[in-house]
Amino acid sequence: MNFKEELKKRSKIVEEALERFLPPSTVFPPLIHQAMRYSVMGGGKRIRPSLVMAGAEAVGGSAASVLPAACAVELIHVYSLIHDDLPAMDNDDYRRGKLTSHKVYGEAIAVLAGDALLTLAFQLLAENKAGRPEDTLKVIHEAALGAGTKGLIG
């Protein structure tokens, strides 16, 4: 299987998992959940989660065991895009050919949706029972560093 085929296969797996992990848009608070889904399910190649899965397989693990972590990486990425698109940052109107979250839902809901995605990412990491607890803590620590001022924000 070539790279593009492998990426497409993994992308489908990630899309299905994200659909399961994201809260339904009808559950309270519906507008925030709608904005989360709009931003996450709005396209993208899912390269980051695919790399997480490939990395696990490269060291003898399974892609399935790291699927929650792979999705968490994607949620952190989308959170950063939502915040980056805001008027106070880059003030982008479009992302992946669609109106940005703040253009559809307003700035306040977009900020809350991004915050909720970041929180959900850490929830997925914390709830993953596939590995040893001490390894889970290391993953959470690395994700926090990567999403904070020593990573994305810095």
Stretch-by-stretch model annotation:
Residues 1-22:
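N-terminal amphipathic/basic leader segments beginning at the initiator methionine
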Residues 9, 22-154:
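Mg2+-dependent prenyl diphosphate-binding active-site environment of isoprenoid biosynthetic enzymes
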